[in-house]
Amino acid sequence: MPELPEVETIARGLAKRVVGDRIESVWLGSKPEPLKSPASRIVSTLEGSRISDVRRMGKHIVIELERSAEESGSRVRRSIGTRARAGRSKTKSAGRSAGATPATSARAQWIVHLGMTGQLLVCSPDTQVEKHTHLIAKLQSGRELRFVDPRRFGRLSVAMNGDFAAAGSEPLDIEPEPFTDLFRGRKTPIKSALLNQTLLRGVGNIYADESLFRAGLRPRRRATTITREQFRKLHGAVQKVLKEAITLGGSSISDYVDADGEEGFFQLQHRVYGREGEPCLVCETPVKRAVIAGRSSHYCPKCQK
């Protein structure tokens, strides 16, 4: 699953390519799973909107939209299936007519969660449409913004008036003391606490393992046994790992690519994640794997206590 660095990389790439562009038309595929908002609401909100900003919030990509309230209320929707370009097969989907009353807010947000295998790509119109494409937004510039997701765990939704808010604290902004206070009284393993998105948003399996290694803490260690000084070290490790990963474009392990379809390189810097049985890069002790709360965790039994 794309984590904070991957989502941040995609958001930054999109911001460079699509901010200021306008969405002329939207095509939706036939699969309902990716749609967290009604299809008609997504189409009526996106079409005609100008993209004013793209940013990350936790593991979500938030695309800020602007349009006049008059335009929002007056635009008449056609059937979603007719949005396919000439030459692309049209998809019929029962009950997914776009005839519902469109949103009249002048500000809205298009929220994308990539799930396990989701990709949000900027493409030229002549780029071949991949099999698992669920949304195509045709832009005024001539480019297209496509959402592709083979496993369909990703989600697309819209929110009015900037109402969307992700739970949890932002790991790149939080200071050491509030970070410590989030976790110190919890009896759960520190790895499980780091993955709790209601506490700290955006950190997933990869970056929790890498951060705990740099902080010298075993993933199964109870948060209540960790000292304030150790939490300060963990805070610094989390921020350093995330920033390094963003610089290298994230970790491409399975399906992840950025907005231009390019892979990241931070997987080449992993010190423990995915390295079970391989020698620790610090002490040469074989890296171990443990299952904690149903998630694989990788650690060095000598460097981490």
Task: Annotate each language-model stretch with its function.
Residues 1-305:
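Structured catalytic/nucleic-acid-binding cores of DNA maintenance enzymes
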